[in-house]
Amino acid sequence: MESYSDLPQLPILASPRQAYAERLLHPVEEAMSTTVAEMLVETLHTIGVRQIFGVVGDALNPFTEAVRKDKRIEWIGVRHEEGAALAAAGQAKLTGKLAVCCGTTGPGANHLVAGLYEARKDHAPVLAISGGVPASRRGIDYLQENNPDLLFRDVAAYTQTIIDPAQAVQVVHQAIAQAYHQRGVAHLSIPADVIGAKLSGPAAVASLNTLRPQPEVTPPESEIAHAAQLINAAKSVAIFVGNGARSSINDIAVLAEKLQAPVLHTFRAKDMLPYDHPHWIGGVGLIGGAPGMDAMRDAELLLMLGTDYPYSEFLPTRTQTIQIDERGFVLGRRMPVDLGITGSVGPAVTQLLQQVQGKTDTAFLRKVGEHRKQWNATLDKHAVMPADPDKGPIKPQYLARRLSDRAAEDAVFVVDTGVVTLWCGNWIRQSGRQRLLASFNNAAVGTSLGQGNGIQALDRNRQVIVAAGDGGFTMLLGEFMTAVEHKLPVKVVVFNNREWGLVHLEMEEAGLPAFEGAEFPNLDFALFAGACGAQGFTAKTPAQLEEVLGPFLAAPGPAILNVFIKPSELPIMPHIKLDQIWHFGMAKIKEAMISMGGAG
């Protein structure tokens, strides 16, 4: 199986494969015996697609047959179309390249939609292909008929039904172009009697060299000069980075050193620098820490690079702020900014490095760095081996830290949504080569395994660790069979607390006792793994965790580690308010009264 480096790249991505570029620039027009399905497969392969995720169905038969005959694209059949969409979203989020998923007519397409929101909300290029009822039967409430354009209108940046083979080549080109340039979902509905039909014109999509990620946008020189003036005048500067700064992080580190500035990050940007980098202070908000929050508040100037951080309640309102983003519409929409610059982070930072003056006063950086040491020490205290390692359940902080300690240097962590996000976001420490993905902006429970399968399919030799709560894992439990069937060696760690943990915390924060629906019984996840033909492990105490963690991570195929964690453990808040303490206390009193049969 090809590794990441083996996949053909577009010239814009600095590929050495000039032969590949030549193929893009000079497509071959084949005989008119080519079908719409065959043209689509050829196009996808030419632009670098190597897997397609989906569930087979009769409306897709001509397409899946074209994939089978072509043999260059791997079909990965999933157990639920949402899993296909999540797998494609995971690939696209990790690589920035187009990924593809499929579902058949009606319900198959419906099931894709929930997973496609993962790509929409995290701005990842995904092409979704759905079958459709025969064009001649549309409009008469035919079996499984729906309105695909209406169904996909919100989730997709582009959605189109191909009703005539003559339009197929141009529409396919447009769909891929829109997925890249809108950084989101493009959807094609192709009726059963169209996808297998012969093309009446050119059999290849022209101008494939235009189908690539958006080029960088150079910001206006005058605005960068203004930003440099503000930075030079500020006594202290903090830099806040998001995923839009990923490709420029090395230059940002140089800028931070020149300005004696701490660098803060969003959750999605957590993996951009090693956790122990001297300027890497930490995150903000609940999946962050007090040092980052305080640095952002106390700096005389905040420089925001490539971030549209959505939680405005954690952002300062009185700090002088410069925001740089190539999406001009996000400037100033979360907080007031003094200077908003439309442009890509890379060229902006390059220009700033040439124009800003180096700062020699290290007092602010040293103060923030000392705060980081204290905060990390607090986190460490919650992640040590307990005095009695044979006593369970296991603290989730300890589990997350041990995963961090034992993971491969280039491991990919895929974290589900819920309280598991807090444990992994705060206690996993990444080396710089490791990656961490989650449902960053969709915040959907049950998305981690599907995304993990997609990422693992890119490179079956790279370690992929899925961290999920028991509730989230059971939502798409069948996707573990996808991993087994297609030999995707994902390692699934189940944070088993027998409840919807984050919902429980939110109830208590509001002063409410836990609702009975917040708790549930579980199956034996280790036995389930064995029933699927994989390996399963269980840990109920820290000692057992130490015993099984090595064999679990070394398992040659997919595996599940079922870890019984302490359900009552509370996350560490950056700043706790008195009313939160009061509400938690009242909730615990109410829960105790209910358990004793008293009034709620």
Question: How does the language model describe each region?
Answer:
Residues 37-40, 45, 58, 63-67, ...:
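Active-site diphosphate/adenylate-binding microenvironment
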Residues 146, 174, 178-233, 383-384:
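Conformationally flexible catalytic loops at phosphate/diphosphate-handling active centers
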Residues 93, 243-326, 431-461, 474-478, ...:
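Glycine-rich, anion-gripping cofactor-binding loops and their flanking helix/strand elements
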